[in-house]
A protein has these predicted regions:
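Amphipathic alpha-helical segments enriched in hydrophobic/aromatic residues interleaved with Lys/Arg
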Residues: 2-17, 117-174, 178, 186, ...
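A ubiquitous short alpha-helical element
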Residues: 50, 134-142, 192, 220
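Basic/polar phosphate-binding segments, predominantly the helix-turn-helix DNA-binding elements
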Residues: 174, 178-184, 193, 209, ...
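Basic, amphipathic alpha-helical hairpins
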Residues: 153-164, 179-188, 203-216, 236, ...
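N-terminal regulatory/effector-sensing and dimerization cores
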Residues: 31-128
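A short, N-terminal "cap"/entry segment at the start of jelly-roll beta-barrel domains
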Residues: 1-35, 39-42, 48-49, 131-135, ...
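N-terminal positioning helix adjacent to the helix-turn-helix/winged-helix DNA-binding module
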Residues: 146, 171, 193-204, 240, ...
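Charged, amphipathic alpha-helical coiled-coil/dimerization segments
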Residues: 126-127, 238, 252, 261
Length: 309
């Protein structure tokens, strides 16, 4: 019982220190890049509407407030007692659901390098490189004292910028090791292992991102993954929670929304630019994902952002 109590006290202590460091190095709400290239700090004094984007591999540790992330129809909620890992590029929606001016949402976000993960896998266990079945490429796990300790030490380097070039890579490597050693570390491990089904799905995802405007050719994607088409569908859905076609639609629709918001472009023109042949089909699928047809959605977005067309 004493060990459990000490562990809980350590977690709370590290969370408080990390919160203080993030408050110190964030000037108001928003995403704050730091002198450590892979590290950004996020702060919000209010809850938010859902935002849609493609998230690259990353670790997110929240010390105050909470957030919900949607991957297809699956929901993942995390806050001060847990952390989130995304192991490959995934189109998700994210919403801060707990935040206030007195207790703002605070998040430590670290980009993950799968090559570094592979190096650690090889060093930690160079003999056993067993390729397991595909697993979902996003997970939430309980925070640990060693992980938070490393996050605190990395953030503390912002007070001593001259130490960053030497010490930051070592601590980032330690953080990655802690994630790999976690209960769901196999997700990241399998994604890093060349030739594993998860790694081959990551290759397909990269191809879909490059060619999202082109017609979907399952045979070509299957060949790139060295899988049969039926096997590709199964593994792709296990990792991303969606089919290749659904993934492509998410990419197209998110890019369309970005273009409509940033360029005040015509909806039909944007539909063709992102690969749709039918503006009416584009409008239907847009409304299904974002809740409103294109023009109504962009009007709502501008109101939320306080922007004038």
């Amino acid at each position: 019982m004493r060990d459990l109590s000490n562990h809980a006290n350590s977690l709370v202590s590290y969370q408080k220190e990390l919160s203080l460091l993030m408050e110190k190095h964030t000037d108001g709400d928003g995403i704050h890049e730091t002198l450590i290239p892979s590290l950004s700090l996020i702060r919000s004094s209010k809850t938010t509407f859902p935002s849609f984007s493609v998230h690259e591999p990353e670790l997110c540790i929240v010390t105050q407030g909470s957030k919900v992330v949607m991957l297809a129809d699956e929901s993942f909620t995390y806050g001060p007692s847990s952390y989130l890992v995304i192991s490959l590029d995934l189109p998700v929606s994210a919403q801060i659901i707990e935040a206030s001016p007195d207790v703002p949402y605070l998040c430590f976000r670290l980009k993950l390098n799968l090559k570094d993960a592979l190096d650690l896998v090889n060093e930690a266990n160079p003999v056993s490189r067993k390729k397991l079945r595909s697993k979902r490429g996003l997970f939430v796990e309980q925070s640990t004292a060693p992980l938070l300790d490393a996050a605190v030490r990395l953030t503390r380097l912002l007070d001593n910028p001259e130490d960053i070039p030497i010490l930051a890579p070592l601590i980032v490597r330690e953080i990655l090791y802690r994630v790999l050693q976690g209960e769901q570390g196999d997700v990241l491990r399998q994604m890093a292992l060349r030739g594993s089904s998860s790694n081959r799905i990551a290759v397909v995802v990269e191809q879909l991102k490059r060619e999202y405007m082109e017609p979907l050719r399952i045979d070509e994607l299957a060949a790139a993954a060295h899988m049969a088409p039926s096997s590709l569908h199964r593994h792709f859905k296990e990792v991303t929670a969606m089919s290749p076609l659904q993934y492509q639609k998410q990419l197209r629709l998110q890019e369309a929304r970005r273009l409509l918001l940033s360029e005040s472009a015509d909806a039909a023109d944007v539909a063709f630019r992102v690969g749709y042949e039918s503006p009416s089909q584009f409008s239907r699928e847009y409304a299904r994902l974002f809740g409103l047809p294109p023009i109504s959605d962009i009007t709502r977005l501008r109101e939320q952002l306080g922007r004038v067309p």
